[in-house]
Amino acid sequence: MSVAVETFGFFMSALGLLMLGLTLSNSYWRVSTVHGNVITTNTIFENLWYSCATDSLGVSNCWDFPSMLALSGYVQGCRALMITAILLGFLGLFLGMVGLRCTNVGNMDLSKKAKLLAIAGTLHILAGACGMVAISWYAVNITTDFFNPLYAGTKYELGPALYLGWSASLLSILGGICVFSTCCCSSKEEPATRAGLPYKPSTVVIPRATSDESDISFGKYGKNAYV
């Protein structure tokens, strides 16, 4: 049962990592909204790297942010957290692939595989946590500006990339928990194989006849029985 759980957790973490990569490259982290009586013909959408505008004809024009130092602090922080999440996810995916009991890499015993699974599960949990913090931090800034009556700039709504990122982070965390929870079970299996108990062959003991028994058996026959 634990083999199925750790395999399921491994693929769940891999799916979460893939979705985190798609979230980072998605253009729709936030989308401009029509707020109040102002009528606009352009739709603006942004992510962590660039901003785009779509006119009434459906033509989109994108431009990169001018300077990293000119960006808001939360955008730079979200960039760092998302990149960290993907790097941790890749490292956890590699260690988990080696530590799975259905794989045979380097003829490792179960105790070493259990340690690798524990590290891989921890990395996936940290990756999901980094992604969750980055997405939530970005969403909080969107909602803060949206409900601020003194904010005179363009107001945005949550883009579909944020919902994808939340789902990806949750999958990474759940997959990491599944992988981490099976490391104790895998280290306890096959104790006799890991202990290397010595083999003692069985011996057969043949009882020897005593002197009294030999005298009794000799007395059963008379002297005339021997030639």
Curated annotation (Swiss-Prot):
Changing residue 68 to A/E: Abolishes formation of tight-junction strand-like structures. Keywords: Cell junction, Cell membrane, Disulfide bond, Ion transport, Lipoprotein, Membrane, Palmitate, Phosphoprotein, Tight junction, Transmembrane, Transmembrane helix, Transport. InterPro entries: Claudin, Claudin15, Claudin_CS, PMP22/EMP/MP20/Claudin. Residues 25-74, 141-159 are extracellular. GO terms for cellular component: bicellular tight junction; lateral plasma membrane; tight junction. Residues 1, 100-115, 183-227 are cytoplasmic. It holds the Pfam family PMP22_Claudin. Disulfide bonds join 52-62. This is Claudin-15. It comes from Mus musculus (Mouse).
